[in-house]
Amino acid sequence: MTESEVLAKLAAQALDEKKGIDVQILDMRNLQSAPAAFFVIASGNVPSHVSALSDHVHEVVKKATGLNPSKVEGYMNAEWILMDYFDVVVHIFLQPKREFYRLEQLWEDAERMR
């Protein structure tokens, strides 16, 4: 298992621990135009849940690996938080935003790991 795969699974586990909704891991490694090796995608019920999910992913990944995300976007409005760990990008949405952007359909050729 690669370091990136371990990180993706760790992020998904952290999202599960805080009741993230419909947590998925997309393996993008076989896609030519993919911006990362893995996407981890989840939803929260309300903005405070989305923020709490992001905080927990950050805490769990930092404790286990020592890594901080290179960039975090969307934290202030907490409708779609993107956490960039280079080869792993974590997307945490409010459900309506997830339904609107449909990342799983956009990257439908990616292998679903869960």
Feature locations, PLM:
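Polybasic/polar functional segments that serve as interface/processing modules
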Residues: 1-35, 43-81, 95-97, 103-114
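Conserved acidic residues
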Residues: 37, 87
